[in-house]
Design a protein with these regions (language model features):
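A cross-kingdom feature that marks ATP-driven nucleic-acid transaction machinery
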Residues: 1-137
Length: 137
């Protein structure tokens, strides 16, 4: 019974809530004009067909300003371990899926800090935020 209550279903539920927490943090940072590369006027998530991969995909958090044609795409990962490079590359591969934006920024939210190697590899391309950072002032 414990496995049923705290197994995959629980992890999936917490992962979905983590996406909501990440969006709330982004909205707060936007309101404070802090930590974000632009002032967003639209917030949400995206799902649809990726014509390059010929599959359905989603983007966990999306912030946009249609007037300046800037968009931020975010991945929210609530797992103890995962392939960091694969997750970041998948997010980078989603650039261009939302038409009408010329400047795309990326942010990865994770339960635990990304490795230094991953942070160094994607420095300047991707911002990384941990669950702990979401609650700092």
């Amino acid at each position: 019974i414990r496995q049923l209550a705290f197994g995959d279903a629980f992890t999936t539920y917490v992962g979905q809530q983590f996406e909501s927490i990440c969006m709330q943090w982004l909205m707060r940072m936007n309101a404070e004009r802090s930590r974000l590369p632009f002032l967003a006027t639209r917030f949400g998530k995206w799902w649809g067909a990726d014509p390059r991969r010929r599959e359905q995909t989603d983007i966990d958090v999306v912030l946009a300003d249609p007037q300046t044609k800037r968009v931020l795409l975010g991945e929210c990962t609530w797992r103890n371990s995962f392939n960091e490079t694969e997750a970041v590359e998948a997010l980078l591969g989603r650039e261009g899926l939302i038409p009408g934006y010329d400047d795309t920024r990326f942010m990865v939210f994770s339960k635990h800090p990304m490795s230094n190697a991953t942070r160094d590899r994607y420095a300047g391309k991707v911002d990384f935020v941990t669950a702990e950072e979401l609650y700092r002032r």
